[in-house]
């Protein structure tokens, strides 16, 4: 499926933090180039919600303040909240643990206004008070007094993005050149 690019042999690969070589199927970076990572947490308008430290505070917003909240339209991220709040691993595959997480989420479903990725306009307009979202939202929105981001005290998720080349790609050499372009320090800094 993936082409072995040997991107790890490029001179600028030395700038990749070894901690970012986390993919079990590519521990040396022979296939893919890790280029970004982030967290999933809670964006909130502190002027509406008051301080938020975690998922329990987030899920209590509708009842406590009347403010609206949204969660991601992403089964894995939403289930992660249920698993965290029931004390289980976000990577659990145990049917009983998944059911307990589902039950927890269903208990709080009525307070969730929408499951969406379209958070930026909702939070900047004040239509919602808080949202489960990726940390990158802070670069998508205009500065708003009171807008905060927190990684929940109970726990959150982390993601990593990588550039890979398909084995069936017709332009493998250009794809590798693009990966090497991303490795340039002045480009990576952007």
Task: Indicate residue ranges for each PLM-predicted region.
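Extracytoplasmic ligand-binding site segments that recognize negatively charged/polar headgroups
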Residues: 1-127
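Periplasmic-binding protein-like
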Residues: 38, 98-106, 143-169
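Solvent-exposed loop/turn segments at secondary-structure junctions
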Residues: 39-40, 47-50, 75-78, 136-139, ...
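A bilobed periplasmic-binding-protein/Venus flytrap-type ligand-binding module shared by bacterial periplasmic
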Residues: 39-48, 84-88, 159-174, 179-182, ...
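Bilobed periplasmic-binding protein-like "clamshell/Venus-flytrap" ligand-binding domains
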Residues: 67-71, 185-190
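Short, conserved beta-strand edge motifs with alternating hydrophobic and charged residues
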Residues: 72, 131-134, 150-152
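Short, hydrophobic alpha-helical packing/hinge segments within bilobed ligand-binding/sensory domains
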Residues: 119-122, 138, 175, 187-188
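A ligand-binding cleft/hinge motif common to bilobed small-molecule-binding domains
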Residues: 124, 130-146
């Amino acid at each position: 499926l993936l082409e072995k690019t040997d991107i790890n042999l490029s001179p600028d690969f030395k700038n990749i933090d070894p901690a970012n070589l986390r993919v079990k199927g590519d521990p040396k970076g022979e296939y893919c180039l890790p280029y970004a990572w982030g967290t999933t947490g809670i964006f909130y308008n502190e002027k509406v919600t008051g301080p938020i430290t975690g998922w329990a505070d987030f899920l209590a917003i509708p009842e406590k303040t009347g403010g609206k909240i949204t969660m991601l339209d992403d089964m894995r991220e939403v289930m992660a909240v249920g698993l965290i709040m029931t004390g289980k691993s976000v990577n659990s595959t145990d049917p009983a643990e998944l059911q307990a997480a589902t039950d927890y989420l269903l208990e709080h479903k009525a307070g969730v206004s929408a499951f969406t990725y379209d958070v930026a306009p909702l939070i900047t307009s004040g239509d919602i008070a808080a949202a489960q979202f990726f940390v990158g939202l802070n670069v998508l929105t205009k500065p708003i007094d009171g807008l905060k981001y927190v990684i929940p005290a109970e726990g959150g998720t982390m993601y990593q993005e990588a550039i890979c080349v398909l084995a069936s790609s017709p332009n493998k050499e250009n794809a590798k050149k693009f990966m090497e372009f991303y490795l340039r320090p002045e480009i990576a800094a952007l």
